[in-house]
């Protein structure tokens, strides 16, 4: 459903942002 799609998209965005943040903090990209 729509909520499932939105939840999946939000999760993808959150993971991407966390990866970028970790990349900047730890220098492991």
UniProtKB/Swiss-Prot annotation:
GO CC annotations, alphabetized: extracellular region
GO annotation, biological process: defense response to bacterium
Tissue: Expressed by the skin glands.
InterPro entries: Antimicrobial_frog_2
Keywords for the protein's UniProt record, in alphabetical order: Amphibian defense peptide, Antibiotic, Antimicrobial, Disulfide bond, Secreted
Keyword Secreted: yes
Entry coiled-coil feature ranges: none
Disulfide bond annotation, renumbered to this chain: 23-29
A Pfam family that the UniProt record links to this protein: Antimicrobial_2
Subcellular location per the Swiss-Prot or TrEMBL entry: Secreted
Similarity comment: family membership: Belongs to the frog skin active peptide (FSAP) family. Brevinin subfamily.
Protein role: Antimicrobial peptide.
Protein name: Brevinin-2Rc
